[in-house]
Amino acid sequence: MKIKYDYCKISPDRDKYVVEYGHNTYKGYTLSSPIKVADRAFSTEKKAVRFAKKIVPVECIKKEEK
């Protein structure tokens, strides 16, 4: 999968982990609030992080704690 997003947030939700991803910049300008493209749910944190690393650079991944 090609890296094409620059915003990613992993948050726990009940018994799953939700990965939200999208765009944080537009034509070189940083947006005040990121544009969410989609989200996916995974059963474990390891699977969520593995997916996130495929679609965004590692420094763009933000994790939320319970």
Protein language model features and the residues they cover:
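A short, exposed loop/beta-hairpin motif centered on an aromatic-Gly-Thr core
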Residues: 26-50, 55, 63
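Short N-terminal "domain-start" leader segments
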Residues: 1-31, 58-66
